[in-house]
Structures are given as structure tokens and as C-alpha cells.
Amino acid sequence: YVPVKSYAAAVSAFRNGQVQLAWFGALSGVQARSTVPNSQALAQGVEDQAFWTYLIAHKSTGLKVGDVIDKNMRGMTMTFGSKSSTSGRLIPEFYLTERFGESPDKVFERVGYSGNHSRTLRLVESGSYDVGAINYAVWERELAAGNIDTNAVKVIWKTPAYPNYQWSIRGDVDAQFGAGFSDKVKVALLAMDDPKLLKSFARSAFIPAQNSDYAPIKRTAQQVGLID
């Protein structure tokens, strides 16, 4: 087991062979698999089949809740999460660019990267930023725990669903550990039913995944210039 502190560090560890199996977000998984030929997505959480990002806004903005992104946010300040985050950057950047016809750095007065979803929430809640992009699961968890001042910050828009986290394995593991090793790892992941283990991932179970599930993520990343 090799702990890492960021998506970028996880991708580097996978590329350099420090780890053969890793738990990635959708974007970091695409990035990592592209560095090692024949690498495969093996499994995803049941909850990862459909993930969402929320755009949240401080009350002072007067931005409206709607089915489309409120164009009145032009000229405001915006914070994403980690630069390599699927839910905290890639997906919201894609839809903001689609809505405004230009990249966020041209839409907003200032664009920041908080580093994580909890920090994004606090920055918008405090008014340090007008608007933020946050993983829906983090918002819902904090809301249920009573940790959000809903008089200060609210959800104004929800993205369409997209696939997110997954287990990915290097393409050279069968050569390194023996024929069929990758399949055995996949079977073990899908059979995981220990409540404590699943709770550590905030997942109810793992189900099969494959690279093609993340083709839309790859295309989106290419369109916004995050990968070649």
C-alpha cells in the first residue's frame, strides 16, 4: 500500500510502477492508463455509474437556481477544486465553456483552485469566492451533518450524470505476476463485501468497469485541453 496526497501523485505512482493497482477519479484514471500500455479499468463503485457536480453560489451574488447555468455569473469569482479533479474541475469547466462559449478564465474575474471539495465549500460559504464547483456527494454529506450555512450558500445548478471513480490496473501485471493475475484482482474487487472496507470507500459495492466507460471523460478532457 502506497498512500498519495493528490491525483497527480497517484498518476505518477502508477506510471512509474510504484503501484500496480490504484483507485482513481475518472480523469486521473484516464491520464494514468494512457501512460502504461494495455492498462485497464477493472471495477467501479455502484455509486460511480452516475455522479454529479453542483455549482454553488454565495447569497450575495443573487444567482438563480435553474436547469441552465445563470449567465449573470460572468465577471464574478470562481473556484474549482483540484486541477486534476473530474468533479471539481473537468466536468464543470466543460459545461461552463459550453454555456459561455469561452473558457472560465475569460468568463470570470478570477479563477482559483481550492485543492479539495470541502475547501471549495468553505470558500464560497464565506464569500471568498462567488461561485464554486463541488462534488455532489460532499455537499449532500455536509448538508446532512448540518455543516452548511444554507443562508449563505446554495446549489444553483447540477450537471448531467457522468461516471467517476474506478480501480485501474497496469497493463504489465500479467507479465510481472503471472497469467490471469489481472482477472484474479478483478474477481477479488467485485467480491468485496466487508462493510468496513466498503465504508472506507463510501461505496455499497463494486461492479465491473472497462475503459470504454470512460471514453466520454477522455473526450471531454481533450476538448478542454487537459489531455492530448
Question: At which residue positions do the language-model features occur?
Answer:
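Short, glycine-/small- and polar/acidic-enriched structural segments
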Residues: 1-66, 136
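Short helix-initiation/N-cap motifs at beta->coil->alpha
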Residues: 1-12, 27, 103-122, 163
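Hydrophobic residues within well-ordered alpha-helices
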Residues: 14-15, 73, 124-125
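A ligand-binding cleft/hinge motif common to bilobed small-molecule-binding domains
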Residues: 23-36, 97-98, 123-126, 130-150
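A conserved helix-loop-strand patch within extracytoplasmic ligand-binding domains
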Residues: 45-101
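Periplasmic-binding protein-like
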Residues: 45-54, 147-189, 199-216
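Ligand-binding cleft/hinge of the Venus flytrap
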Residues: 72, 87-113, 141-148, 219, ...
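Ligand-binding clefts/hinges and TM-proximal coupling segments of bilobed small-molecule sensing domains
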Residues: 77-98, 183-228
